[in-house]
Amino acid sequence: MNVAYLCLAIGFLVVVAAGALVYVTTPTNAGWVRSFLGRLTRIRDVSVVQLGRAGAAVAVLLALSAAAVIITWPVGRFFRRFRPQIDGPILRWTMRHVNSTGTWHHVNFVVTHMGNRRQIQICAVVAAVIFAALWVRRGWWIPPVILGSAIVFEKFGQAALAKVVDRPPTGLPGFGTYPSGGCARTVILWGTVMYLILLTWPTISRLWRVAGFTVVALLAFVEGYTRIYLIKHWSMDVVGGWLFGTLLLLAIIGASSCFKPCRAAPAAT
């Protein structure tokens, strides 16, 4: 049990330290990062001019969501190949040391529900209503469409990955598939909510921006911790959920950015 507490504490410290590192540094100052982001921005702006904001958002979302699945798929196959060396020892250790009737087990059982599909859907509906009210003058329908797309694309993307990766079952009750849907949903929902906050109040300071996404990362870590602790997933299913959730969140952010003011289109030559 002490090791379980230690793992939780170390995870918290790592996530917070990563957030602090992002805050004190400016990764986008790197030349190659600025160049890459600049190219993506120009592609987005041209797409908005050619397809309109809604059309560009759909095109970006479809392209980047497909990329998220394509990237996460071989990672899952790799995890499947090395399951005996990676997941097996972790699962056996957890089964030997976890107390299925203690207070800590009950706490984990309650907390892990934050990543369940129904709870995520309820939170998404509440967030959609709130942001729709805040976006009345900008287009009240935009936040609900963004949040709804996040939920739908996660559901079908996760289902597709579960089929093509086809991780072997354990025979344990309630054991999930690759990638962990709870972890992916936690990243996608709260990451999308955070990005909508930034779109709604664009003058928010960098400190609060970094702090907000650090909280999202902490929620995702806690969800993954509970899924492993409660023996609901292979450990690498959780890592896959974080990966897929992050990539799909980037797709949602890319699509949502099409509704931001864009630069003037380059003049024809």
What are the functions of these language-model segments?
Residues 79-99, 104, 118, 122-214:
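Membrane-interface loops
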Residues 71, 75, 157, 161, ...:
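Alpha-helical membrane-inserting segments
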Residues 1-119, 162-170:
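N-terminal transmembrane-helix/juxtamembrane module of multi-pass inner/ER membrane proteins
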Residues 2-8, 23-24, 28-31, 128, ...:
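Membrane-embedded catalytic cores of phosphoryl/pyrophosphoryl-handling enzymes
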Residues 17, 63-66, 70, 145-160, ...:
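Hydrophobic, lipid-facing residues on alpha-helical transmembrane segments of integral membrane proteins
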Residues 6-10, 56-60, 64, 141-150, ...:
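Alpha-helical transmembrane segments of integral membrane proteins
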Residues 71-74, 155-169, 222-233:
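C-terminal ends of transmembrane alpha-helices
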Residues 44-45, 104-109, 124-131, 219-224:
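Hydrophobic, membrane-inserted alpha-helices
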